[in-house]
Amino acid sequence: MDEKDLATQPEEAGQDPRLPGPHEDPRRQERAEAQAKKGPLAPDAQGKRLGQGPPKAGGRLLSLKGDRAFQRLRKGRAGRGRFVSVKWLPAPEARVGIVVSKKVGKAVVRNKVKRRLREILRRLHLPKAHILLVASPEAREAGFAELFQDVVRALRKSGLIQ
């Protein structure tokens, strides 16, 4: 690198020329606020916004473990949506099991659906219960907002949330 390539003006102290300044795009904050108002997090009947709950267990959901836990859930209360079906039983702590069969697609697609369902459940105010979510093959085509609304609908039908 030659000396002629270097800037001749000294940089102002504390400013990085690679980072945009706050003055460069005045509409940036407006667009971010407008985008935050949209989406599946609309208020419910009581005016409480779904999805605004604190994350569970430091942001992670506790998983259902073992065959027995899944077998017990067969006797639980059920609800069905377009993309998921839900079964649940009251329990001393909130635990979640997510089932995505190979009918949904290859591993990458199944993992994407599982990540979305985990994130949706993490955002909801869930009571203490063991919950089983079973994704239908149509879940692979659903966007996050559609999946969110469908999970809420199925949980309401099952009686887990109001």
From Swiss-Prot:
EC number of the protein: 3.1.26.5
PROSITE patterns for this protein: RIBONUCLEASE_P
Domain of life: Bacteria
Compositionally biased region (Basic and acidic residues): 21-36
Assigned GO CC terms: ribonuclease P complex
Assembly: Consists of a catalytic RNA component (M1 or rnpB) and a protein subunit.
Protein's name in the database: Ribonuclease P protein component
Organism: Thermus aquaticus
